Amino acid sequence: MVDDKDLKIPEHVAIILDGNGRWARAKGMPRSYGHVKGCDNLEKISDVAIEIGIKYLTVYAFSTENWKRSKEEINGLMKLFRQYLKKCKKMADKNHMRITVLGDPTAFDEDIQESIREVQEYSAQYNEHFFQIALNYGSRDEIKRAVNKIADDVRAGKITGEISEDIIASYLDTAGLPDPDLLIRTSGEQRLSNYLLWQLAYTEFVFTDVAWPDFHREELMDAIRQYNHRDRRYGGVK
């Protein structure tokens, strides 16, 4: 058994933050309570990730499909996003962390879009740690947007010759980031839900029954322990 101090820490961890609403319902509370607690936990886990040596953390906070939820729940989530984005500059300073929002921000109200721009511009000064938050993100939408941009640049003569994987990757929301080494999904579901479909080609998956608000340092370390028992061959043979 590998001692925790000897664990290989994945450089890039992606997390699907799932189970806030069900966690709250199980406690007899409204779904909004779960989202608040889940948001609080995100700040804590981002600190833990940096503490243990994870350089890149990418979290799935709001998908393109989540707009189908009730108006009341959507309004509550927008309020949370506004509050969280206001904290992000202090988080960036504390952890020397660059914060990037993945997805299409144009669906949000202008004040949220402006907060996203401000956080990204402000935190661009840091390159020690990288925190990506997927908001109004769907991988198929990301790929569609990338293909349209590539087509525009081909027509403009900016791209000639064959379209390589590297070219496609450079047009994705995650351009410049390494692919995730480890994906964690909380709350027992075992599916990708349209998350980072291009980027997860050789990523190791860990699914946990623990809901996101209860996912703390020990649960993260347990996922990393499981990761350390995987043999990553990238399609080859060892």
Language-model regions, residue ranges each:
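Flexible, compositionally biased loop and terminal segments
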Residues: 1-238
